[in-house]
């Protein structure tokens, strides 16, 4: 296991994107680790470093990104996802609780008549839904472009109302955060959509050729495309203690997606298909974090205390041992193995 700085990780990711730029519109980075391993911190620092470099390039070069108008080349990301029958839409709008423990349920879609976007729904209903829009993204008003974005797994926590419909709702609430309490069906469907965008081939403006010289950031700025749909991803509202739809957006300006979560390498149910889905794109880097239990315990216990989930540090430790530690051991014992999964540390 090697210690990596945000600067070093950013160098690796940008080199990888440079190698893939002629064949892959975007690349994916999967960051996996148990509670307290620092995966969120690493992901945030990585994206901040990459975005800072890109915006510094724009400022110093005096250039602006070029968003190609390819409106006649719209990409149907949701092709192949079955549609809800009209009679089922009432159930969707009123909770959609009947499939909450069905790990084999295939997500379905419907068209939002208000804006024409497609909404993809799994076992968690609308709170865990994905929205896909074929609309050109707006340029940021402050010109703060984010070519790297985090896509967290947290938005696929089943809502508390959905946990109420488990066969054993008391146990479901007690073990919230364990694999069965996630909408893994729609999380996998999101990964399939994102992987599909990775395989889109970038196109250069008509006045450019592959022989033109330039930096990586020059080439990125020249190959943004309106034809790449925007994908709205649920997040988690800690104040409400429930998922929140559309909290994150992966749009045409996003060239690096950083997926972070506990179970993205878990060799169980729908989770086990996430890594192969991205592996098939030939455009993914996978980092796994693993620290000693003592370090994890102290980090998570302090986090529980600071967030109000525990009244004392001792209560935070107890909460860690009753839930987080069980999840951490499950990840360790049932983790997919592959030669290209790299172990890193942020001690």
UniProtKB/Swiss-Prot annotation:
InterPro entries in alphabetical order: P-loop_NTPase
Signal peptide positions (record): none
One GO MF term: kinase activity
Annotated residues for binding of ATP: 33-41
E.C. numbers: 2.7.1.-
Domain of life: Eukaryota
Keyword field: ATP-binding, Kinase, Nucleotide-binding, Transferase
Segments passing through the bilayer: none
Sequence similarity: Belongs to the YFH7 family.
Function, as annotated: ATP-dependent kinase that could be involved in endoplasmic reticulum membrane assembly.
Protein's name in the database: ATP-dependent kinase YFH7
Lineage per the UniProt record: Eukaryota, Fungi, Dikarya, Ascomycota, Saccharomycotina
């Amino acid at each position: 296991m090697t210690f990596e700085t945000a600067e070093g990780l950013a160098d690796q990711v940008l080199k990888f994107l440079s190698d893939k730029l002629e064949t892959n519109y975007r690349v994916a980075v999967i960051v996996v680790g148990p509670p307290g391993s620092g995966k969120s911190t690493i992901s945030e620092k990585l994206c901040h470093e990459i975005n800072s470099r890109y915006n510094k390039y724009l400022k110093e070069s005096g250039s602006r990104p070029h968003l190609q108008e390819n409106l006649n080349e719209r990409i149907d990301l949701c092709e192949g996802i079955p549609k809800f029958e009209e009679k089922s839409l009432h159930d969707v709008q009123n909770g959609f609780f009947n499939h909450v423990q069905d790990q084999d349920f295939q997500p379905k879609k419907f068209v939002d008549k208000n804006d024409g976007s497609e909404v993809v729904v799994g076992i968690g209903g609308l709170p865990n839904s994905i929205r896909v829009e074929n609309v050109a993204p707006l340029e940021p008003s402050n010109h703060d472009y984010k070519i790297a974005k985090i896509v967290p797994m947290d938005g696929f926590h089943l809502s508390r109302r959905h946990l109420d419909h488990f066969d054993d709702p008391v146990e479901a609430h007690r073990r919230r955060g364990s694999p069965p309490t996630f909408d893994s069906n729609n999380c996998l469907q999101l990964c399939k959509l994102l992987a599909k965008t990775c395989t889109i081939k970038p196109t250069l403006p008509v006045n450019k050729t592959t022989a033109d010289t330039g930096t990586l950031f020059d080439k990125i700025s020249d190959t943004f495309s309106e034809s790449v749909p925007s994908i709205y991803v649920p997040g988690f509202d800690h104040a409400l203690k429930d998922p929140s739809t559309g909290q994150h957006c992966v749009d045409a300006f996003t060239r690096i997606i950083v997926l972070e979560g506990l179970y993205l390498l878990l060799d169980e149910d729908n989770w086990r298909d996430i890594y192969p889905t991205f592996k098939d794109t030939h455009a993914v880097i996978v980092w796994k974090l693993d620290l000693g239990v003592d370090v994890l315990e102290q980090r998570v216990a302090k986090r529980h205390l600071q967030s109000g989930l525990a009244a004392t540090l001792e209560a935070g430790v107890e909460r860690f041992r009753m839930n987080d530690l069980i999840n951490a051991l499950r990840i360790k014992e049932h983790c997919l193995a592959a030669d290209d999964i790299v172990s890193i540390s942020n001690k």
